[in-house]
Amino acid sequence: MVTIDPKELTDLEAVAVTVWWLGGAGFAINAAGRVILIDPVIEPKANSDPVASEIGLPLLVPLPIRARSIDRADAVLLTHDHGDHTAPRTIPELIARTHAVFVCTERTAKTLRNSGLGPQRIRIAQYGRTLKIGDMSITPTVAKHEEERGSTKRGDCCGFLIDAAGVTIWHPGDTELMEEHLRVRDVDLLLLPIAPHTLGTEDAAKLANATGARHIIPCHYGTYDSDLYWCVGDPEAVGARIRDAATRYHVLAVGEKLVLPAD
């Protein structure tokens, strides 16, 4: 079991870029003192049961950190409004305990408003339109997920290209592989969903190789004790298909971190 120290996560004096895997598609980032959360699902279903997740599935390991222990965040980025990304217990805790700005699509924003978040703390994600939050730049990227597959519907899901402390981090979100994705370059860290309802093994490796990302962390697997299609993935199979995986590809335990130097 790996735990995340809330003081380290929220350290204003941090000089590096530290990225923790929260499980699922979720990540916590401290970029030289700036705190970013992506798709955090970090509250239990009930306070007394640390391995019963808030979305109703048992966890393989206890939560590495809880939302109620986080008292500072600059931005919360939500790729879409499914419960394993926009979490029913985590989001209200973060709304109440932090002053974070929430970046999401209009569909997800409706969920946030229903949770009591005021419009001054919501920034609507539009593909390709860069948002500034302090000294960070966040650019939503195109995504197509599940009900959008095979249709012309766009805009309910997104990824995020983040530039913070001189480091570029890309989380494509839950998406099938799209032509636009293959044109993304100059990525320092790729947060790579590998579950079969997202990129899956072959397309995840294809994207990793196309971007030439300097570092890659697989996600969206190995979190819930379930064989549901969106809970499983094979990080070793993905790694076997990635060029120079020994130096680029980092398979983390839930709660484990990767540290990159800030520019």
What does each model-identified segment do?
Residues 12-17, 30-36, 130-139, 163-169, ...:
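Beta-strand-turn-beta hairpins that frame and shape the catalytic cleft
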